[in-house]
Amino acid sequence: MQFSTLVSLAAVIVSTNAAALLTQTVESSTVVTITSCGPEHTNCPASSPATPAPAPSASAPAPPAPEQPEPSAPAPAPSAPAPEQPEQPATPATPAAPATPATPAAPEPSAPAPEQPASPAAPAPAPSAPAPAPEQPEQPAAPTTKEAESTPAPAPSAPAPPAPEQPESAPAPAPSAPAPEQPESSPAPAPSAPASVPEQPASSVSNSTGPSSVPTFEGAAAKQYITGSVAVIAAALLAL
């Protein structure tokens, strides 16, 4: 505070000195004009035109204008708080910024995302379904014509076994395709295979009126096997 008061006093003194110098220079100029063309000198050739001399006298009131800087002296007073402001920057709020590194913790939850693709391994149980296939081929081993004629109803159930046989060939292309991509497309061909199974048994039943029922069944199974393999290959290509 003492320093600020000293600064303000120095500013006032300087302003007063400057005002005094300005007034002295103005007075000296007026004195020069008066001595050069004063009304006292009657022999002055410029006495008659000296009438405009009052103009310098009019300028004489101008010296008070330099005195106005005195009010400006209080202006330095506000500058005194300036030294006090540097004390405020002492706030060490900036070191708190390192707290932001806490945000990198968020990416950690994203790391488990790559682990989720491991879930597509679930389709692996699908190949286990073909296990019943070896048991079903035992049924067509009895090609008795009399039994086929007497029991036409079981014929529709017989075509069901060939459907599981197709998945045996399906696992071969399955490993070639990436596990995470196929699970989405692989379920599509599965329902298509059973759709074709019930359609063909109808024709086999109509043809099972005589002893030629056995070859028709084998032909239907071969067709189903071909169509199933083609569907599986097409699904694998689409997945790629």
From Swiss-Prot:
Residues 41-216 are annotated as: Disordered. Keywords: Cell membrane, Glycoprotein, GPI-anchor, Lipoprotein, Membrane, Signal. Residues 220-240 form a propeptide. It is a lipid-anchor; GPI-anchor. Residues 1-18 form the signal peptide. It is found in: Cell membrane. Glycans are attached at residue 207. This is Predicted GPI-anchored protein 58. The lineage of its organism: Eukaryota, Fungi, Dikarya, Ascomycota, Saccharomycotina. The gene is PGA58.
